[in-house]
Amino acid sequence: MTNALPPRFDITADEIDLVVAEFYAAIRHHPGLGPVFAVHVTDWPEHEAKIARFWRNAILMERGYDGNPFAAHQAAGNVRAAMFDVWLGLFDSVLKRNLSAQTAQSWSELAHRIGRGLRMGVEAGSVPGLR
């Protein structure tokens, strides 16, 4: 079955899988982000497969992802807005190591747009209701 929409940019599913695997390997070793993820992720291969499906959906227009990243990050309880800069910096370094400059830039721009939305959701979720 072919996708109705073209990919956002030139990348393969295998390249997406590689980036996701390397990113989460780096996350697990990061002194600040590793513990945040460790509280929530008990099955890393399953988590990586889910996130790879998210990116294949967002980039390749494959329809295999079922989830709500905004709700997941809000519900986590230990995700702070300031973490997104570190998170995205780490992601960018993985992109640059594994992809062509143009593909890394295209994916980085998409990740930063999504990251801004996630950050706003976390910030909005931390504001107390005044009514």
Predicted feature residues:
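Core of compact, soluble alpha-helical bundle domains
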Residues: 1-131
